[in-house]
Amino acid sequence: MTAPFPNPHFAISLYCSDFRNPAPQVEYLNTVADSYHVDIMDGHFSPSMGLCTSWIEQMLPLSTLRNEVHMMVTDPDHWIDQLVAAGATMLTPHVESLGAHAFRTLRIIRENGCGAGVAINPLTPFADVENLLERIDLITVMTVE
């Protein structure tokens, strides 16, 4: 299993990077960040679309840093194998999408060699995360719903 991220750490989002030519940006960011934050969106859980697994596969060989893949998706289990194959080191599904299968999903993430985190939306009570604290390495607290 991947060791937890240092606490605190500085993660750079790649959501606004140049998707056609990530190399210059990634090479520079390798020198100033602790890790990368990569947004995956399915257009259902989040109305937007995020980065795709093929882009992650192209970007990761350029990176010397660990990455946190923020899974803004309705069915996190569907994405785990693809994201692990792409090189993810930390998978962070939303607590709102985990439902009754939270423990199972977090276990599957760890069994695949990744760190496990959860993200929480601003209107979701923190109590929804409390029972997961012993099973996670990271919490991403959203500032937008």
Regions picked out by a protein language model, each given a short descriptive name:
Residues A119-E145:
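Histidine/lysine/aspartate-rich catalytic loop segments that bind and position anionic ligands
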Residues M1-T92, S97-F103, R107-A116, V129-I136:
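Conserved N-terminal beta1-alpha1 strand-loop-helix module at the mouth
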